[in-house]
Amino acid sequence: MASKEMFEDTVEERVINEEYKIWKKNTPFLYDLVMTHALQWPSLTVQWLPEVTKPEGKDYALHWLVLGTHTSDEQNHLVVARVHIPNDDAQFDASHCDSEKGEFGGFGSVTGKIECEIKINHEGEVNRARYMPQNPHIIATKTPSSDVLVFDYTKHPAKPDPSGECNPDLRLRGHQKEGYGLSWNSNLSGHLLSASDDHTVCLWDINAGPKEGKIVDAKAIFTGHSAVVEDVAWHLLHESLFGSVADDQKLMIWDTRSNTTSKPSHLVDAHTAEVNCLSFNPYSEFILATGSADKTVALWDLRNLKLKLHTFESHKDEIFQVHWSPHNETILASSGTDRRLNVWDLSKIGEEQSAEDAEDGPPELLFIHGGHTAKISDFSWNPNEPWVICSVSEDNIMQIWQMAENIYNDEESDVTTPELEGQGS
């Protein structure tokens, strides 16, 4: 039996390598930017910070990322990294593509273009790290313990204390187990939600300040789910509404003004397997998306949750991340275990397709990013550069990429480059 499994693993590895070679060959036609960087340790989390600076006379802008580490029994860190991204008018062409690393966009190699600026000691791996929108210096993290930690990275030395001591500015208590979901309220400063394997969602107000030492107790604990709560998200336009999704296959919508924390305002059987993630549309009061172990992304309207608006199908395995574009109301992306990051366009749902096109996926599947050869752990849309995404995978690889403009810009004719090899997912 073991030898059969080993054989299957080897075959899968070969297929993955073959697909990666094809992807690399095609990058000049499919992307306007690809930067590949091997991190010292894999990061389970990634988020662009909102700040950007444009050094005078340079053909690049400086952006920052929040990352974490997942080491093998070595000291873990919360990391802020600085990234050089070339300006649109930077002089480069696809012939400069470094075919060895599959990188281009003005960069033969990314050495020195992505650097860790701040490293802060962390207790165990960083399951997730998210900055507070009202003050991006404040970052909350999920740990392998039940505590949620809060750091103000301006109050920590750029180089971590060699003793390895983790010294968060606040320690948020309320959970019994670890988890992944984490969401800051963009309308109420300091209000943080967290989802946990203990079946609950905790809410803290960090402005309340610690009761003793640095410990802040949960302001409320929501207990509606009957299994691991995978993700939680505040509504982006209503300060008191949030959603949670769990292994009980349910999506729950909560209102913090309600006098009960054991029963959500709305409950829907969202998928036929665990629900791993959710995302509210930043432009719409009513639209949200959920991603599931059933390999689909579902689209919902808060006005009628009994009816699923649409199901996005193309992923070959569990979906763990779904995020709407910060720049386009109809664009969202999803990723997970199948090593693919899919970008979807709602405005193309129901468009007619040739039989040949239909083989590649439904009309709303705008793009498949095939650059990762391991499970994607997290991704983030750049808030300052439309269509730029940073994705991180379990094999230490971080990619910063932007699909070619002619793919999302319909006015131009479609790519009909004869050199383009089969990009099957």
Swiss-Prot record:
It comes from the Eukaryota. The modification Phosphoserine is found at residues 3, 95, 354. Its main location: nucleus. The modification N-acetylalanine is found at residue 2. PROSITE patterns: WD_REPEATS_1 (PS00678), WD_REPEATS_2 (PS50082), WD_REPEATS_REGION (PS50294). GO terms for molecular function: histone binding. The modification N6-acetyllysine is found at residues 4, 119, 159. Binds directly to helix 1 of the histone fold of histone H4, a region that is not accessible when H4 is in chromatin. Subunit of the type B histone acetyltransferase (HAT) complex, composed of RBBP7 and HAT1. Subunit of the core histone deacetylase (HDAC) complex, which is composed of HDAC1, HDAC2, RBBP4 and RBBP7. The core HDAC complex associates with SIN3A, ARID4B/SAP180, SAP18, SAP30, SAP130, SUDS3/SAP45 and possibly ARID4A/RBP1 and ING1 to form the SIN3 HDAC complex. Belongs to the WD repeat RBAP46/RBAP48/MSI1 family. This is Histone-binding protein RBBP7. It comes from Bos taurus. The lineage of its organism: Eukaryota, Metazoa, Chordata, Craniata, Vertebrata. The gene is RBBP7.
